[in-house]
């Protein structure tokens, strides 16, 4: 039901209306052009609306109409491979309607209402179906079966259910109380979708990135943050996670970042193969593009839109990874709206409720038993862009209180061309202990011990670096000289990874383990040789050691590694270290 009021005041993206009988979070059409907005505050007879489009030229006295509905997304077949703006308008539809530059007041349906999908019923006539249970299935892509579910807030006995080709608006099921159900339903973005219960994460998200999988793993259903200064590799790391994570669905939210970065994703993903299925990566991806040149207020909507789409697929029992790049831009949008509302500012001008909003977002991630009895997960990975790389600023600090994995990007590493530029001394993962059993069973019994040994060595190296910078490495005892050489190998062979190399971009667990095992084998044999009287300089000069870094780029990895290890054994035997 539409209720009409009029605009009283305009302050940037915030519009105040009078005579509007609206509820909190109702959608409104603002001004003569019908700009989309959302009610964020009601004070006395005044309704305050944040507008998701540019408000230039909107003036007091123009009409303002409430739709009586909250900001909701359309959920149903046809979501995958889509690219939306922050309020689920498909960008290709907007392109057809308005050309390259999006005009104001344009509306578009989130799903294609004309396309036919083959619906196969699962529920039968006479079945009592509760909210979240499966009515039927649609084969959306070659590898993904889209489960058409009863909306979570409805239930009833099936009176009639159809089979065949239908659009998302046609009725496929009728309940005994007369309720007609379609393949599509709408869900408010600010309301988390219900689940039976939350579960403890038990499996790692396999990313194919050695430093992440090996040293700082994130669990499926976990939360992680990637803070870092400009140019340190946040977006490339996020894109690597989008490409190679072993989840069935990836939702990539480009929130206030450059448009070129979304263009990169659109350019690369259709050409890249998913290592799990061999199909184009775009088939499992949904993009929510809310770039830096789009209106500020829509950034907030884009984060909630992305999370609601992720929850929908989680409810089907799929594992979803959600990339938010960058949460700092979302926080800056909150700061702007807050200042327009003349609220009391908190630290650095951010609103006092910043930490509550961030927590609200990350808490919607997790592993859950869904209403249909399946087990699904959402892994939320948020990039943070602190000004000047200052991790003490409010967005980074509030994010670190919430997330369990911290991948700290370091400008100094990126300047040295060490990528991924994740600082192994500042980063941490609180899932390590929970995932140790999985690594022991699925990778190797000595995997955890090897990882801890490597971390201890890297820690010792950082302590020795201060002495080395003062007096040089030659002044150190030979044992410590060897340790520095081994840690250099860990850094350059294991931790460094080329995102743009066709082979090195993705490293399976078996390969990661063998690389680390080879480095440790060299380290143990080198220490034994040193104890038996071989000078450290002789051990460091070995040819096989210098061939080891090339192995990770070879297609025949196992064959190349075996040849290098055999050569290493001969060289150590010649030195008399064994």
From Swiss-Prot:
<dbReference type="GO" id="GO:0046933">
    <property type="term" value="F:proton-transporting ATP synthase activity, rotational mechanism"/>
</dbReference>
<keyword id="KW-0547">Nucleotide-binding</keyword>
<dbReference type="GO" id="GO:0042777">
    <property type="term" value="P:proton motive force-driven plasma membrane ATP synthesis"/>
</dbReference>
<keyword id="KW-0472">Membrane</keyword>
<dbReference type="InterPro" id="IPR024034">
    <property type="entry name" value="ATPase_F1/V1_b/a_C"/>
</dbReference>
<keyword id="KW-0813">Transport</keyword>
<dbReference type="Pfam" id="PF22919">
    <property type="entry name" value="ATP-synt_VA_C"/>
</dbReference>
<keyword id="KW-1278">Translocase</keyword>
<dbReference type="Pfam" id="PF16886">
    <property type="entry name" value="ATP-synt_ab_Xtn"/>
</dbReference>
<dbReference type="GO" id="GO:0005524">
    <property type="term" value="F:ATP binding"/>
</dbReference>
<comment type="similarity">
    <text>Belongs to the ATPase alpha/beta chains family.</text>
</comment>
<keyword id="KW-0406">Ion transport</keyword>
<dbReference type="GO" id="GO:0046961">
    <property type="term" value="F:proton-transporting ATPase activity, rotational mechanism"/>
</dbReference>
<keyword id="KW-0067">ATP-binding</keyword>
<dbReference type="InterPro" id="IPR023366">
    <property type="entry name" value="ATP_synth_asu-like_sf"/>
</dbReference>
<dbReference type="Pfam" id="PF00006">
    <property type="entry name" value="ATP-synt_ab"/>
</dbReference>
<dbReference type="InterPro" id="IPR005726">
    <property type="entry name" value="ATP_synth_asu_arc"/>
</dbReference>
<dbReference type="GO" id="GO:0033178">
    <property type="term" value="C:proton-transporting two-sector ATPase complex, catalytic domain"/>
</dbReference>
<comment type="subunit">
    <text>Has multiple subunits with at least A(3), B(3), C, D, E, F, H, I and proteolipid K(x).</text>
</comment>
<dbReference type="GO" id="GO:1902600">
    <property type="term" value="P:proton transmembrane transport"/>
</dbReference>
<dbReference type="InterPro" id="IPR027417">
    <property type="entry name" value="P-loop_NTPase"/>
</dbReference>
<dbReference type="Pfam" id="PF02874">
    <property type="entry name" value="ATP-synt_ab_N"/>
</dbReference>
<dbReference type="InterPro" id="IPR036121">
    <property type="entry name" value="ATPase_F1/V1/A1_a/bsu_N_sf"/>
</dbReference>
<dbReference type="InterPro" id="IPR001763">
    <property type="entry name" value="Rhodanese-like_dom"/>
</dbReference>
<dbReference type="InterPro" id="IPR022878">
    <property type="entry name" value="V-ATPase_asu"/>
</dbReference>
<feature type="binding site">
    <location>
        <begin position="228"/>
        <end position="235"/>
    </location>
    <ligand>
        <name>ATP</name>
    </ligand>
</feature>
<dbReference type="InterPro" id="IPR020003">
    <property type="entry name" value="ATPase_a/bsu_AS"/>
</dbReference>
<keyword id="KW-0066">ATP synthesis</keyword>
<dbReference type="InterPro" id="IPR031686">
    <property type="entry name" value="ATP-synth_a_Xtn"/>
</dbReference>
<protein>
    <recommendedName>
        <fullName>A-type ATP synthase subunit A</fullName>
        <ecNumber>7.1.2.2</ecNumber>
    </recommendedName>
</protein>
<dbReference type="GO" id="GO:0005886">
    <property type="term" value="C:plasma membrane"/>
</dbReference>
<keyword id="KW-0375">Hydrogen ion transport</keyword>
<comment type="function">
    <text>Component of the A-type ATP synthase that produces ATP from ADP in the presence of a proton gradient across the membrane. The A chain is the catalytic subunit.</text>
</comment>
<keyword id="KW-1003">Cell membrane</keyword>
<dbReference type="InterPro" id="IPR055190">
    <property type="entry name" value="ATP-synt_VA_C"/>
</dbReference>
<dbReference type="InterPro" id="IPR000194">
    <property type="entry name" value="ATPase_F1/V1/A1_a/bsu_nucl-bd"/>
</dbReference>
<dbReference type="InterPro" id="IPR004100">
    <property type="entry name" value="ATPase_F1/V1/A1_a/bsu_N"/>
</dbReference>
């Amino acid at each position: 039901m539409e209720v009409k009021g009029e605009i009283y005041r305009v302050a940037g993206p915030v519009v105040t209306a009078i005579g509007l009988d609206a509820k909190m979070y109702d959608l409104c059409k603002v001004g003569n052009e019908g700009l989309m907005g959302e009610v964020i505050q009601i004070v006395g007879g005044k309704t305050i609306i944040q507008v998701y489009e540019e408000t230039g030229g909107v003036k007091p006295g123009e009409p303002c109409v409430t739709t009586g509905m909250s900001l909701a997304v359309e959920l149903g077949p046809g979501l995958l491979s889509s690219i939306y703006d922050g309020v689920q308008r498909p960008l290709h539809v907007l392109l057809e309607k308005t050309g390259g530059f999006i005009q104001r007041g344009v509306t578009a349906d989130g799903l294609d209402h004309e396309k036919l999908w083959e619906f196969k019923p699962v529920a039968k006539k006479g079945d009592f179906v509760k909210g979240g249970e499966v009515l039927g299935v649609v084969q959306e892509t070659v590898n993904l079966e889209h489960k058409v579910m009863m909306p979570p807030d409805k239930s009833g006995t099936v009176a009639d259910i159809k089979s065949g080709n239908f659009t998302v608006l046609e009725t496929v099921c009728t309940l005994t109380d007369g309720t007609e159900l379609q393949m599509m339903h709408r869900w408010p973005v600010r309301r988390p979708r219900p689940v039976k219960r939350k579960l403890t994460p038990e499996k790692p998200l396999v990313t194919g990135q050695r430093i992440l999988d090996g040293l700082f793993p994130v669990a499926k259903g976990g939360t992680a943050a990637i803070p870092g200064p400009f140019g340190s590799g946040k977006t490339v790391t996020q894109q690597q996670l989008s490409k190679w994570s072993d989840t069935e669905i990836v939702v990539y939210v480009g929130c206030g970042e450059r448009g070129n970065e979304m263009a990169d994703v659109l350019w690369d993903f259709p050409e890249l193969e998913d290592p799990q299925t061999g199909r184009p990566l775009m088939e499992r991806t949904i993009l929510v593009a809310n770039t830096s040149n789009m209106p500020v207020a829509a950034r907030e909507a884009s984060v909630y839109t992305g999370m609601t789409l992720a929850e929908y697929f989680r409810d089907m029992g799929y594992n979803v990874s959600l990339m938010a790049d960058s949460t700092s831009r979302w926080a800056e949008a909150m700061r702007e709206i807050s200042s327009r509302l003349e609220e009391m500012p908190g630290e650095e001008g951010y609103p006092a409720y910043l930490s509550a909003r961030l927590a609200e977002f990350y808490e919607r991630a997790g592993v859950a038993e869904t209403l249909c009895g399946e087990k699904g997960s959402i892994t939320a990975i948020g990039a943070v862009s602190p000004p000047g790389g200052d991790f003490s600023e409010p967005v980074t600090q509030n994010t670190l209180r919430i997330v369990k994995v911290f991948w700290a990007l370091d400008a100094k590493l990126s300047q040295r061309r060490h990528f991924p530029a994740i600082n192994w001394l500042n980063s941490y993962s609180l899932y390590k202990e929970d995932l140790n059993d999985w690594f022991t069973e699925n990778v190797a019994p000595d995997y955890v011990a090897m990882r801890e040994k490597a971390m201890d060595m890297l820690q010792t190296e950082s302590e020795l670096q201060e002495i080395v910078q003062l007096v040089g490495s030659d002044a150190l005892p030979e044992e410590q000289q060897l340790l520095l050489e081994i840690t250099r190998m860990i850094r350059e062979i294991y931790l460094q990874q080329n995102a743009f190399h066709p082979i090195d971009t993705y490293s399976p667990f078996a390969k990661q383990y063998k690389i680390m095992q080879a480095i440790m084998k060299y380290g143990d044999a080198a220490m034994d040789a040193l104890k038996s009287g071989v000078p450290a300089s002789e051990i460091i000069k070995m040819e096989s050691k210098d061939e080891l870094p090339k192995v990770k780029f070879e297609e025949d990895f196992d064959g190349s590694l075996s040849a290098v290890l055999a050569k290493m054994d001969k060289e150590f035997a010649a030195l008399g270290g064994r």
